[in-house]
């Protein structure tokens, strides 16, 4: 079991003054059934959830979960760390990508992701990751869906590939990890920045500066649950409900109240993903 999954649950946050979505989590990795997780989230004002796949089985699970639960939509892809293994598995590269393309066409699947580049880990060679990233960009454009990016220690290459390949209408940098300069580069291209619990960490003043630097229409919040629990729940099991803490941190970084931030984030999510 992952260390994150062995942690104790966090108490419910104070409910938000209005509802917002958790724009990125992994419901398939949560402990226990989905229903109670969604109920806890709703009590905290997190009324909708985007559950995200990292390989074919978890992407299929995400699509099925979204079809079953009205408050859930899905994103499907091969995570960059899984690309080499996927290419070596049944169906090979083209067969796996065809399965992702089929899932991306489903109406409750609203994004292709998480895809991108991860140069922090060496699970897949960089050239393999770049090839799969380009293929996912093509799938997102063909399906008319948003592109949800995993970018770790790869800012320049991610931006270069998006520019060279041609980005879809909506691009989301999941768990944005760049500084203010990177945020401004993304904003110039119209890319959306989704902030996770890392925004609340004492060690992340650069993230808060980035969150304050971009236009409000380019902001989302997420949990990446069950990972990256925000302050004051660090060390606990993350869950979609805890996006309420990150929403308040985002509001504070921008110098506005939580109600105004809720309205902004909810409106942005519907523009990027469509209504649900």
PLM-predicted stretches and their roles:
Residues 1-276:
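Mid-domain alpha/beta scaffold segments of enzyme catalytic cores
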């Amino acid at each position: 079991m992952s260390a994150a999954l062995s942690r104790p649950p966090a108490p419910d946050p104070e409910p938000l003054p209005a509802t917002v979505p958790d724009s990125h989590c992994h419901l398939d990795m949560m402990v226990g059934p989905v229903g109670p997780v969604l109920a806890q989230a709703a009590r905290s004002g997190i009324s909708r959830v985007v559950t995200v796949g990292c390989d074919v089985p978890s992407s299929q699970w995400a699509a099925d979960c979204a079809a079953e639960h009205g408050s859930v939509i899905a994103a499907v892809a091969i995570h960059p760390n899984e690309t080499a293994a996927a290419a070596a598995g049944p169906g090979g590269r083209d067969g796996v990508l065809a399965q992702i393309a089929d899932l991306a066409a489903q109406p409750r699947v609203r994004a292709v992701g998480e895809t991108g580049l991860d140069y922090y880990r060496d699970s897949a060679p960089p050239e393999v990751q770049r090839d799969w990233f380009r293929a996912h960009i093509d799938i997102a454009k063909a399906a008319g869906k948003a592109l949800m990016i995993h970018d770790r220690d790869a800012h320049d290459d991610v931006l270069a590939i998006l520019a060279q390949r041609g980005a879809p209408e909506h691009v989301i940098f999941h768990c944005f990890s760049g500084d203010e300069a990177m945020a401004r580069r993304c904003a110039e291209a119209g890319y959306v920045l989704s902030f996770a619990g890392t925004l609340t960490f004492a060690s992340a003043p650069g993230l808060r500066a980035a969150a304050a630097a971009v236009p409000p229409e380019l902001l989302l919040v997420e949990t990446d649950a069950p990972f990256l629990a925000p302050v004051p729940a660090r060390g606990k099991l993350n869950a979609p409900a805890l996006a309420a803490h990150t929403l308040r941190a985002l509001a504070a970084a921008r110098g506005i109240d939580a109600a105004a931030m809720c309205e902004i984030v909810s409106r942005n999510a519907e523009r990027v993903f469509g209504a649900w």
